Amino acid sequence: MVHAQFDPTSREELAIAAVEAKIAKDLSWQQIADAAGYSPAFVTAAVLGQHPLPPRAADTVAGLLGLGDDAALLLQTIPTRGSIPAGVPTDPTIYRFYEMLQVYGTTLKALIHEQFGDGIISAINFKLDVRKVPDPDGGYRAVVTLDGKYLPTVPF
């Protein structure tokens, strides 16, 4: 049976324990995702409390991290999503995304609506990918792909 989790505290505590275990076992998110059989973005979000994992993946992740049966069950619950507290984020990495949306949010809205019409991009039917690519000018660039299904507004 599918269960919903309404108190984010237990998932937050599990996320802390999972990250501590990940560090202690010197595992990457990619290794955890490979074991679970899903993308690194999805598994990372799930372990950090933003998605439920399917039963087999939850058992695998909990086992790999040494978290036990209770953690495996908790990883399967539908969480209360939204890990950023109200207000402006203070973590520099998260803040840069906030800043990008402050600068380009209206541009994205205008371009999306021009191409698709009135509606939204789903964060449920959604894929996320992060890649590290060489920068021709030296160093590296982060390529972040947000791939969501377009859902048109339907008059009623």
From Swiss-Prot:
It holds the Pfam family Cyanate_lyase. Keywords: Lyase. The keyword Cytoplasm does not apply. It catalyses: cyanate + hydrogencarbonate + 3 H(+) = NH4(+) + 2 CO2. One of its GO terms (biological process) is cyanate metabolic process. Gene3D superfamilies: Cyanate lyase, C-terminal domain (3.30.1160.10), lambda repressor-like DNA-binding domains (1.10.260.40). The keyword Lyase applies. It comes from the Bacteria. The active site is at residues 96, 99, 122. One of its GO terms (molecular function) is cyanate hydratase activity. Its EC number is 4.2.1.104. Catalyzes the reaction of cyanate with bicarbonate to produce ammonia and carbon dioxide. Belongs to the cyanase family. HAMAP family: Cyanate_hydrat. This is Cyanate hydratase. The lineage of its organism: Bacteria, Bacillati, Actinomycetota, Actinomycetes, Mycobacteriales.
